[in-house]
Structures are given as structure tokens and as C-alpha cells.
Amino acid sequence: MEQVNIFWFRRDLRIDDNHGLFQALSAGLPVVSVFIFDPEILKHFPNPNDARLTFIHRCLASLDQEFRKFSSSLQVYFSSPEIVFGRLATKYSIHSVFTNTDYEPAAITRDQKVADLLRAKGVEFHSFKDQVVFHQNEVVKTDGMPYTVFTPYSKRWKEKLAAHPIQFFESEKLLHNLKYLSSDYFPELNEIGYNTQNIAFPSREIDEHLLENYAGMRDFPAENVTSRLGVHLRFGTISIRKLTVFAQQYSEVFLNELIWRNFYMDILWHFPHAAEKSFKPAYDHIEWLNDEQDFERWCTGQTGYPLVDAGMRELNETGYMHNRVRMVVASFLTKHLLIDWRWGEAYFAQKLLDFDLAANNGGWQWASGSGCDAAPYFRVFSPDAQTKKFDPHRYYIRKWVPEFESASYAKPIVDHAFARLRALETYKKGLK
């Protein structure tokens, strides 16, 4: 039986500057590349028309086409990782399995199970840093404790980067070390219960001009000055290392956004309870109203507040929402409507193409006040004030809520002044 190494693709669907793939291809044995559609993960994608599955499938097909240039192919499975690796162990003499580290709580548990299974069979399991520039224990306080405030974390992060310049891994130059695998078969998406969507996804190309104007225009939702790279960062079709170097050259503000991403991943690693509960436990005592009709109006963009409704309609139609508007709609749900942040977090998780557990959780807990380094509970965004400041000509609103000046437009779901006072009283009571 031929001895091989295996590379397990997950949130790293690219061949260039892929750390784990580089290590696998450098280890001296032919490499079998695999991707696993795990039913435990897919249960979080209940909509058969979820465009994220189309994105993943296209990425896998692209990888497969690249590998065929080297007389190999990507092996795609639909099963649990434990079952897949059990089968692969009967097909090959596996020396090692290589992959890139996933920092989410469920992924950590999964990888430990797989590592234990493989080691019981005498197979080594190697995981590498690829999703982030610095992993959870590299940017910490002098006493080794994690940061829970962004500004000192960011300062320390940049100091580390200056002291340890980024190293690239030229995995794309080693594809000749893939194992020869002749196969004309590549699975269709409908074989795992999903329908292919006719959708144009954002480019993964980095726009230098956009980044040069990012700082001054990023808060204006009508302007096309955001990178739209979130989906590529989520599924690893772009290298965080390359993107960081690019940001260093063109935009300090954009670099800070990448650091926020790293920060929230570190928070989730060190404080896994935040995935389901408030980072600050006292906030779990807030008595939410959780009115289902109000929630439905928020979801469908019928609150009577044009900026909120524009954001929700954009999300529902495109799977994207401008970051400034994300803050406004999240604040509105949690403070104007007094609906648990977890309801909004879950809705975003179903709708966002770029959904990332750490970033989504961190953003929602920031807006509700329950997170680390969050907006104070008494900061209640005024949708009208935000509109005047960031969409003064209503270009963004007119695109998504064309009826907003007509009699047919929904009446405000709640008065802003009343909602603000109610939120302050509710938060004060819950935080006693």
C-alpha cells in the first residue's frame, strides 16, 4: 500500500500562500487533497438555496481544475470527518494529515476527535496557522493574559508585526508533489441537497484605489468603497498574509479592520462562552421583550426607519450589508426593540455570505453592549442622525426603500425618544 500524506481543505480554499498545503507538499510524500462536506456543519445551512454552498462548490471545482493540470484531483466527500479518515486509512498508508487551524469552538472539538482517531491508527495530525496573522497566544499582555480591549491589543499586534515580518508560503509552486489521481468525476451540488445559485460573487482582487480612499469614505453606504472581501476571508480564498501586507502599504484604517477580525477570533478562543452567552455575564440578566412581530418587521425591512429597512433589504437580497449599517440595525434591534442580540446574530448567520462566527458574534455583542470593549449600553444610535451623517442625500435609502417618501411606507415601529428611554431603564434594571 502506497504511503501518502493528506491535506484537508477547510476554510482555506486556495492554492497560493496556503501554509498547511505548503507543509504537506514539502514533507516528502505524495499528497492526497480532500474536502469534506460535514453533515454536522451543513445542518447550520438549512436553506437549500443558500448561496454560500454555491460559492464553496465553485471554489472546490476551481481547485480541482488546478490539480488536474498536475494529473491529480480534489477528493470531495459527504460524511463525518471521522468516517472519511477511517475509510482513507483503509485505502492508503497514511503517514500524516495536514490542515490549517480553525479557531471556532466546534471546530476545536472536531479537530481533537479527528486527531485522537488518527493517532490511534499511528497517523500524525499537523495543524498550521493560516486564518490569522497571529494566533491566540501571540498577542497577549505581559502577564500572558489575553487582551479584552481593542486599542492596546492593536498596538501590541502592530509591534509584533514590525518585529516579525510576514512570511509567505509558496504552496502554488509545489503542486507537482500531489499524488497522481485519475478521475473524471466531480460531485454536483445537488448531490448533497443544495441548489446551484446564479449569482456573481465579489472579486477577490484587491483594489489599490479603493484602499487609498477607504479611510475617508468607508462609512458612507451609498459609496462603493468597501472591499467586499469578507466572503473570501471567510472561506480562505484570499491570503490574510498577502492582504495584511497590502493594507500596510495602502490603508492603516483597513489594516485596523483586519486586526479587529484577529481580535474577535482571539476573544472567542479565550472566552468560548461568548459564542452563546454574553461576554459580560451581567448582560444575560436583561429582560428582553422579544416581540416576534417586531422581529419579523425588522427582518423584512418594514420598521419605518429608512436606514434600518434599507440595510435589512440589502442583506435579504444580496447577502451583504454595509458595515456602518450593520451597526445601526444591530443597535436598533437590541435597544429600540429590546430583542435579544442572539436573535439578530442568528438571522445574520443565515443571511450573510461572509458570515464568520467570531466577527458576527463580536459585532452583535458590541452593539448590544454585552461584549468586550463594547459600545456602552447608554449609546443608542439614532437612525435619523446616522442617515443625516452618512446618507445625507438618501442615495442608499432610495436604492433599497424607493417608497420611503410615499404614503405606502411603513409607519415607525416605535418612537425613537420613547425607545431610547425604555432601553436605558431596561438595561439599568438588568445590570443592577
Which functions belong to the PLM regions below?
Residues 1-161, 250, 313, 425-430:
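Trp/Phe/Arg-rich N-terminal binding region typifying the photolyase-homology
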Residues 11, 112, 262, 325-327, ...:
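Hydrophobic alpha-helical segments, especially transmembrane helices
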